[in-house]
Amino acid sequence: MKKKVYYWSPFLSPIATCKAVINSAFSIEKFGNNHESYILNFFNEFSLFRNEIKKKNIKIINFYKFNFFRHLPYEGKIRSRISFIILFIFGIFPLFKKLKTNKPEYLIIHLISSLPLILLILFKFETKFILRISGFPKLNFFRKILWKKALKNIHYVTCPTENTLNYIKQSKLVDESKLRLLYDPIITFKEVIEKKKELVNFENYYLSAGRLTKQKNFLFLCKAVKEIIKKDSNKKFLIAGNGEEKGKILKFIKNNKLENNILLIGYVDNIFSYLNKAKGFILTSLWEDPGFVLIEAGICRTPVLSSDAWPGPIEIIKDKYNGYIYKSNDIKDFLKNFNIFDDKREKNQIILNH
């Protein structure tokens, strides 16, 4: 009988972690001879990826018949916090019951990690808990207390970058023997080739992508674009994603008459077709771990301009070799590097190094 591996990763809006979960589960299905993977579809959030999950023969465990996902707000800090509380209340007992009844070999925790970690503190399980660091962890007071207690009973903690691994080591919140470096899984080149073929209804643009949050720093990009178009009003920038700062970004675009230069295109299921056609990819994040879209841009051989965000981008991008790096949140340095980045001859050299 195969050992069961459960994935816990509830989300309010699609992010790169969702695809990482699917790819990880698929890897277990494909290469784990004695294991089978299950994604816990807590409130119907993974129905967005139903076709891909079915195609990859990954099993789904549904918690509720009612589609919570359609009704939970995710835009705005207060509303997203309310949604988190709702998820916590409706999730803690069903997850406890699933683990006690089904007794999977492993529970891999990606998002909303506090819920299963609290269960790990309060109860004993036959299941081995694995915490996957998804995004750079801000060790605030609550998280430090929670991790200090919960990680005593954790099986492993996996980190997507060496910088994060060292950061967790230095925190001394978990025994070093339980730490592992594990890079995020990516789809096969065959799949990328197929996805790149899809048509995109835009031409001659730069692309940015991610949740519209403070972390992604898209307002900074909008301010930079305002300066860029003073020299060339035909420049076009697409931002793919949804999130709590959408209203602020739209307001800035409207107030500065940037509607013809900056387009918010919402969440994009297939980012590869957009990356393939883009003049370049721009990452303005304040921090990333690892910065999954940088890897996707590299696969598409799309030139990259990235902030020197820690821990992922600074580890992935080597300045003027496989991309360009600017000082995070520094408009002058961004504009200087964008001018070089915008030079076709410079970009051709970067493409050769991907």
Q: What does each model-identified segment do?
A:
Residues 319-320, 324-331, 338-345:
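Conserved acidic donor-binding segment of nucleotide-sugar-dependent glycosyltransferases
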Residues 7-15, 27-83:
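N-terminal strand-loop element at the rim of the active site
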Residues 136-137, 163-164, 182-192, 211, ...:
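Short beta-strand->alpha-helix junction loop in the catalytic core
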Residues 40, 303-307:
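Short hydrophobic beta-strand element within catalytic cores of glycosyltransferases
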Residues 267, 286:
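Aromatic "clamp/platform" in nucleotide-sugar-dependent glycosyltransferases that forms part
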Residues 154-179:
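A short, active-site helix/loop in glycosyltransferases that binds the activated sugar's phosphate group
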Residues 88-91, 109-115, 133:
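Short His-centered aromatic/hydrophobic patch
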Residues 18-26, 204-230, 244-250, 292:
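A conserved mid-protein helix/loop that constitutes part of the nucleotide-sugar donor-binding site
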